[in-house]
């Protein structure tokens, strides 16, 4: 489930460090979270769609790796991003 271009840029603008920042961990986590939420809704309707389920699991694992990286590098940013995106935080 692709996300709309406008929504993607909205997410980028809210998490970027400077005007041309589109690849920082915070931005990547925000975009992945949006895609995960969309795909989760799709999976509720289409329980037997195993290809999408595999993609969903891959996205969740990628987001977890990015969150772990952010937690190691900048714990304060990790907490801010987690709170802003309503993600559960393990202490």
Curated annotation (Swiss-Prot):
Tree of life domain: Bacteria
Q: Which GO terms describe its biological process?
A: translation
What keywords does the record list, in alphabetical order?
A: Ribonucleoprotein, Ribosomal protein, RNA-binding, rRNA-binding
Name the species this protein comes from.
Hydrogenobaculum sp. (strain Y04AAS1)
- Outline the subunit composition: Part of the 30S ribosomal subunit. Forms a bridge to the 50S subunit in the 70S ribosome, contacting the 23S rRNA.
- Entry's SMART domains? Ribosomal_S15 (SM01387)
> What family classification does the UniProt entry report for this protein?
Belongs to the universal ribosomal protein uS15 family.
PANTHER family from the entry?
A: RIBOSOMAL PROTEIN S15, BACTERIAL AND ORGANELLAR, SMALL RIBOSOMAL SUBUNIT PROTEIN US15M
Biological function: One of the primary rRNA binding proteins, it binds directly to 16S rRNA where it helps nucleate assembly of the platform of the 30S subunit by binding and bridging several RNA helices of the 16S rRNA. Forms an intersubunit bridge (bridge B4) with the 23S rRNA of the 50S subunit in the ribosome.
Q: Which NCBIfam families match?
A: S15_bact
The record's section on Pfam families has: Ribosomal_S15
Instruction: Please give the start and end residues of each transmembrane region.
Output: none
GO CC annotation, single: cytosolic small ribosomal subunit
* SUPFAM superfamilies, A to Z: S15/NS1 RNA-binding domain
Quote the protein name from its UniProt record: Small ribosomal subunit protein uS15
- What's a single GO MF annotation on this record? structural constituent of ribosome
